[in-house]
Amino acid sequence: MAEVVAEVAEVAEMPTQMSPRVMEMSAPILGEKMELSTELTEMTPGEAVASSLFFQFMCSECGNLYNTLEEVLSHQEQHVPTVTEEEALTTQDTGLEPELVPGTEEGPFQCGECSQLILSPRELLAHQDAHLRESASQIQYQCGDCQELFPSPELWVAHRKAQHLSTAAAKPPVPPPLPPVTPPPPPPAPLEVKMEPYECPECSTLCTTPEEFLEHQGTHFDSLEKEEHNGLEEEEEDDEDDNEETEEEEEAAAEVGDDAKGGDKSAAGQAQGSGDGPPHCTSAGTRRRHRRASHGPASAAHPFYCSQCQRSFSSANRLLAHGRAHVGGTHECTTCSKVFKKAASLEQHLRLHRGEARYLCVDCGRGFGTELTLVAHRRAHTANPLHRCRCGKTFSNMTKFLYHRRTHAGKSGAPPSAAPPTVASAVASLAPAEPTPPPPAPPTPPAQLPCPQCPKSFASASRLSRHRRAVHGPPERRHRCGVCGKGFKKLVHVRNHLRTHTGERPFQCHACGKTFASLANLSRHQLTHTGVRPYQCLDCGKRFTQSSNLQQHRRLHLRPVAFARAPRLPITGLYNKSPYYCGTCGRWFRAMAGLRLHQRVHAQARTLTLQPPRSPPPAPPPPPEPQQTIMCTELGETIAIIETSQPLALADTLQLCQAALGASEASGLLQLDTAFM
């Protein structure tokens, strides 16, 4: 044993360490293995090797560690229960061993290594000795340099002396290798920035060249035109186009004729819609030739004809879009017989007949049935258009502005690219340069006609008059009654008015049986049955059934408020004594009729200012000088009348009277002579 310890001391001086696997395997413990890798890593190499050659034994009951097996066995006897005197007497009577007497044991013993149950402590000791021999035979020692395993520490020490101590003394210490020299990384390549200066305002797409930008804008232009065409097919637009106004007037006149003549047109329409109608044309050219040949030049504006509903269209695209409404279920308007593909489109169209204005203009208060017509109307209020061309034209749509600009710079809209230099151009460049003529002055824009009521200006008098009529003038009444000639703002108002001539009252109250000519009158009447007064005065709390009554009542409370027109929005409390305001001179009027009469005065004055100045009229002749009249009388009779511009003396007056008297006597004698003859 002393020799082994001496060899261990020599090995401790070697600069080697055992692997954690050897340290773990060199510590067999009774019942469990003790992991000493953490503790051994903190020791010196000599202490680690010395500790790896000793065994420790653990008590399976309390976990205490002991260096020898005898100490563990003597310690475990403390855990064995003691035998009482009664149990000893019972053991003597039976003649059995104490550990074998039933009832004297608290329970079987269990091996902490393999968890096997054993009846007696003696069998437990024998069983644990078997585990100890197995663990001792499995212990192997590993060389830290060559990773070779040895069953005993003696062989491991001999291997270390023979193989590694001699080679370590012969070889000089090798310095640690230097880290490899890595070449410096190349400088980063400059980033190529792709310039895309043209951004589409519709979808924010970036384009590199003007050609790509204009081609991309063309897609938005086509979609915009398609949407406008679809909107014109399914909806009645209330814009300021003269052609559409003429068509609506013709429709109103035709409907008036229907009511007056008793439906002659409907019978004619049925006859036209029968099988004798025009044949179905397969192409646009055939349809156009057929319309011109059959219906004359008057139908050239709408050459495309629908064979199912007898409607005509101005383009083939509109006819195709209309034809889709007849496929897969249709929705027909009972008022004007128009056909729609979707129920939502029909409901939107019916709002036009009912006179509903869901889209209001915040500038002038006018109402529109569709959002498309409101957007078209809002362009009239734009003071400065967004896009202005150098030729003087202005555009509110950027796409149309770009297409217009292409007319100035060729098809692509980009400046022409420079041609490659030639020999002639090189020779010409060597010659003395001639003075370049000054660039032509840009064309002057046409004179703008300002609006006298707002800061807008227009290029033509027709646009100015249209703007004043639509924005500043009174509401137009372009729909006329064919019976009495009364004008209305909407076609639905004409239809309601015609019922006053025919005596028709289609709307009946279910509560009292009264009939009314319009749905609005019926709705106001039904408030009398329900007792609901939805309009309340914010000052005194009084309620009214109609907004007009509340408006008249509010004039008693509020002072004048500066707004240009009576509000058409729901009740907000902004009313005053004189709600109608003249934007030209600032006067207020109680009624709209008074404001209209007053605005005619301004209109006449503006008409005189717009007319060219005329030549001054000729000066009137000077008035005649005042004359003095002198009457000469004798015996109550006037014998002479003297008129003079200057007063006469009395003597002169007497002489004139005597001369007149002598002349009168002579004439009297002459008359007597002629009488007697």
UniProtKB/Swiss-Prot annotation:
Zinc finger (C2H2-type): 57-79, 109-131, 141-164, 198-220, 304-326, 331-353, 359-381, 387-408, 449-472, 479-501, 507-529, 535-557, 580-602
Subcellular location field: Nucleus
Comp. bias intervals (Low complexity): 410-433
Biased composition (Acidic residues): 233-257
Residue span of region Disordered: 167-190, 223-300, 408-449, 608-627
PROSITE patterns in the record: ZINC_FINGER_C2H2_1 (PS00028), ZINC_FINGER_C2H2_2 (PS50157)
InterPro entries: Znf_C2H2_sf, Znf_C2H2_type
UniProt biased composition (Pro residues): 172-190, 434-449, 613-626
Molecular-function GO term, any one: zinc ion binding
Stored SUPFAM superfamilies: beta-beta-alpha zinc fingers
Main location: nucleus
Basic and acidic residues biased stretches: 223-232
SMART domains: ZnF_C2H2 (SM00355)
GO terms under cellular component: nucleus
Annotated function: May be involved in transcriptional regulation.
Protein family per UniProt: Belongs to the krueppel C2H2-type zinc-finger protein family.
UniProt name for this protein: Zinc finger protein 526
Organism encoding this protein: Bos taurus (Bovine)
Gene name of the record: ZNF526
